[in-house]
Design a protein with these regions (language model features):
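Short acidic-hydrophobic, aromatic-tinged amphipathic segments that line or gate anion-handling sites
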Residues: 212
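Segments forming oxygen-rich coordination pockets for charged ligands
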Residues: 1-208
Length: 212
């Protein structure tokens, strides 16, 4: 299992390289409680395929419906990046399953450039930290390798987010508790290495295991 952001970007890059319409959604602002933190991303293909998440599920369903039915009045049509806000009213928050008082704002990028996505994924595979900046008016994207992670910045016409290598966790011993801990760590963005000379302990793990 790989880092969730890399997983999302890799699938998005593959879809775009194949000529498929797709969008990239990112959580850029939240008010009150939010199911996913700022910077969380999701890729949505024209076929309805989804990788990643921006909420507990209801917002994803709404995005799929609006992106897949372009004839509807509230459809999400290709074009310049778009800001979309959910949970403005109590009724809307309840309908989309947002926590009490929760509101979130998404940046939607339609059909990101395939070559730029492939370059981004390549840098991430090499273990580099990358700062990606989107111009909301034009959709132009600037990507550059950076030395350290920075929080998402939404200022003026630009949104900048950092993507980079996972934190690393080393576990000594491949017992049952280590398996549970490793699984939780993977879901929280860690690259996990488990060291244990007992090969029989590695046979039934549900995630990638290194033994030594």
């Amino acid at each position: 299992m790989e880092n969730l952001d890399v997983h999302v970007l890799r699938h998005l890059a593959q879809w775009r390289a194949q000529g498929e319409r797709a969008l990239l959604a990112a959580v850029v602002r939240t008010w009150g409680s939010s199911p996913r933190p700022i910077g969380s991303i999701m890729a949505l293909g024209a076929s309805g395929a989804v990788v990643g998440s921006v909420s507990g599920g209801c917002i994803e369903d709404d995005l799929i419906a609006r992106y897949s039915h372009a004839s509807d009045a509230d459809a999400l049509r290709d074009g310049a990046p778009r800001l979309l806000r959910y949970g403005v009213s109590a009724d809307e928050a309840h309908r989309f399953g947002l926590p009490c008082g929760g509101t979130l704002e998404l940046l939607l990028e339609f059909n990101p450039d395939a070559a730029a996505l492939q370059q981004l994924v390549q840098w991430l595979d090499e273990g580099r930290m990358v700062r990606r900046t989107v111009d909301k008016a034009t959709g132009q994207v600037a990507q550059q390798v950076s030395d350290a992670p920075e929080p998402l910045v939404h200022a003026g016409q630009q949104v900048a987010n950092s993507f980079g290598p996972e934190y690393r966790m080393l576990l000594i011993g491949a017992g049952q508790l280590s398996e549970y801990l490793a699984t939780m760590a993977l879901f929280n963005g860690f690259a996990v290495t488990v060291c244990d000379p007992r090969e029989e302990y590695s046979r039934h793990w549900s995630c990638l295991l290194y033994t030594s």
